[in-house]
């Protein structure tokens, strides 16, 4: 470990400059989810459970956005290592065309059949009626978010990690203000409840896109080649399909798996309380993982650039070892802090703030302890899958390692314990986390094999 961590100050300074803005961007984004949950929770547990259930299909949209963003980032980071700017414009063009088409199809489905889709998420029909107005609106916000996220990924991949932090900081302030006005009907605005939360999100996403469009047309770092952007060519489409579409499929099925976990909770005998607790703890858990997500994204940029520059396999292995150990140590520190805060802050202050009492508070504590204890495992998985393997062009294995433990272990085990055996919530919570224990050793084996290193910018015969 100590040998792997022995790097000069410039290395860690560069890692911090990449990680810091990305972590802050994620903190801002996840804080928005927490603020949304806090505001909706003031309407009652039923409203919060309804929005949690409505966000199950929405999470699929988020996963597709992240998949397109991550997939195009693989190509852009390696093209950036070669300083091939026209190919960056082509990659953005392909990603934008395919991404918007996918997001629009799902948004239309949510708009046309909201109640029917909500009925699949929970066995409580009154939650479907509460959540349907939210679902009709929220899907269209991710059409604009798709375009913004692709441009943020491009800026991040050319080492301008602060752009996304500034953009999402602006949109979070706007979204929070609009939430307050539209959910509660302040300053002369109508009181729209959960529908107001969706409209506020849509307006903030439109503002994000407008800022990205303005910056894209003026950027000197990656000046857009409009001809390459709108006519990217079949070769770029082929490369995107080869290397980015598996990432998109990966994120889609990973998102579907997470959504099914929520559906399982939504069909328990204590579904309203479990959904409310899960809504709060899901957001809090993500807040503690923001640094790990930042390190994972920074790892992807550094690995992708190093491959594009033509560094040797030994150099790439040394780099991957260093980044892995940094992530594990950071994850362990975060786990200790988070677990200490459960009795000191969450139980006496945070849970009552979100109207979680009695059974809901007990379930939230259960989810907190199991989720926080697994942070080091999540941290390494994020760095290995979304950072090292994915940036190395090892798309098949990064997908298999992330999906197999989830679909073959976590989902069936959680369903068995929650729906068939009606097991204690502690066992259900541990089953939700089971995939992490399996994923980590397999990721380590794959990275040590060195077979994950691929230069995806080279023609087929030269790799």
Name every feature range the model reports, one short phrase each.
Residues 1-22, 76-141, 189-244, 303-374, ...:
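Short alpha-helical transmembrane segments in multi-pass integral membrane proteins
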